[in-house]
A protein has these predicted regions:
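Glycine-rich ThDP/TPP pyrophosphate-binding loop and its adjacent helix/strand module
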Residues: 1-34, 38, 247-353
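General beta-strand structural signal in soluble alpha/beta enzymes
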Residues: 128-130, 202, 235-237, 270-274, ...
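Generic secondary-structure signature for well-ordered alpha-helical cores
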Residues: 39, 43-46, 56, 60, ...
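Proline-rich intrinsically disordered, low-complexity coils
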Residues: 63, 76, 86-89, 101, ...
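Thiamine diphosphate
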Residues: 134-262, 277-281, 318-327, 336-353
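Conserved acidic/glycine
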Residues: 1-171, 181, 336-338, 343-345
């Protein structure tokens, strides 16, 4: 204030004194300061011209387009092919009798999503990070080339700025916070009309899912209450259940994955594909909806892919409906009830009987 006062020869009432003890006095003091500043503007046309010209110049200096910005008016999130279940290519799936974990099915579809987006729109659709589990949870698939061997590796702000895979550590809360923030950044010309930006995907052990809950719940509230359009989050609860394997003594959480259900109705979809071939159809169907959060529960070990046709089971693509028949009623027996099964080891055990 002193520099301003000396330069424009104006006094600030009670300048240098302690602030008033009551709110009314503080408001009065603030008003007097503003009056002093405005008095200079009223009596100094040169200052007004300078401020106006400077503001106009700054506004006109903002480019209408930034050449090196990867996000353009072409919007991959509106590309129905990426999430179209009937058109999913055969090489996303493995043949009956082969052994594969469902997390590998996730990796394949992740690479399919971003490869299609990069090839058609010049940028990935999904930015991913993991709690030091990028490869074991297979979220690293978002940085791999679909149908090829190219691996973009981990993002580096100097050496590798094009990779969609962030090098995060065991910082679950921070990871979900960063991606919740990222998925609210809308580059669309009218952010109230549609979302054009990046989706986020993050992973950790299912037993540590609760560490991600807070920021994701806040993201859910924005999606629910704000008129601004937001993106989507893929919340991977990896290595879930008794299949946690060698880490089971410290990393096996029975109840923790239940935190993925603590959202308002219609604001999260929980996916539990029990085998490799169900992942892509289930995730594609979920991403085709307007639901902003998808929790994908995956397991660690490989299991044998069933021969669905021989067993009379529905196609793996029926996983896109959320539930399907493994075995229908025996028409020669009375109807004795329904068995509902979910999860890798439980469903695998039932199918093998």
């Amino acid at each position: 204030k002193k520099d301003f006062s000396d330069k424009y020869n104006v006094d600030f009432h009670k300048f240098g004194e302690k602030e008033a003890s009551l709110k009314e006095g503080q408001v009065e003091q603030a008003i007097s300061y503003f009056d002093s500043v405005f008095s200079v503007m009223k009596s100094n046309q040169g200052l007004v011209d300078y401020l106006a010209d400077t503001l106009i110049s700054l506004g006109e200096s903002v480019p209408s387009n930034i050449d090196d910005c990867k996000i353009t008016v072409k919007n991959p999130s509106k590309d129905k092919k990426i999430f179209d279940v009937p058109s999913l290519p055969d090489d996303l799936f493995v043949s009956p009798g082969e052994k594969a974990p469902n997390r590998v099915g996730f990796s394949k579809y992740a690479s399919y999503i971003n490869t299609l987006s990069i090839n058609k729109y010049g940028r990935p659709l999904v930015i991913a990070m993991s709690a030091d589990l990028a490869d074991s949870t297979n979220i690293s698939g978002f940085a791999k080339e679909y149908g090829g061997s190219k691996d973009m590796g981990l993002y580096d702000k100097i050496k590798n700025i094009n990779s969609p895979l962030m090098p995060q550590g065991i910082t679950e809360f921070a990871n979900s916070g960063m991606l919740a923030g990222l998925a609210t950044v809308n580059f669309n010309e009218d952010p109230y009309e549609e979302f054009n930006g990046y989706y986020g995907a993050m992973s950790t052990y299912g037993s540590f899912s609760y560490l991600k809950y807070g920021p994701i719940r806040l993201f859910s509230q924005i999606a629910q209450d704000s008129d601004l359009k937001v993106g989507k989050l893929i919340w991977v609860a990896g290595h879930s259940g008794p299949e946690t394997a060698e880490d089971s003594r410290t990393h096996f959480g029975i109840f923790a994955p239940g935190v993925t259900q603590l959202f308002p109705d219609g604001h999260i979809i929980n996916l539990h594909p029990w085998e490799h071939n169900e992942v892509a159809p289930a995730l594609a169907a979920a991403m085709s909806t307007n639901v902003p959060i998808v929790a994908l529960h995956l397991t660690r070990p490989p299991i044998t892919i069933p021969d669905r046709k021989a067993l009379g089971m529905a196609s793996h693509k029926e996983a896109s409906k959320g539930a399907y028949l493994i075995k229908d009623y025996n028409k020669n027996r009375p109807l004795e009830g329904v068995v509902i099964v979910r999860g890798t080891s439980s469903t695998n055990s039932l199918v093998s009987i």
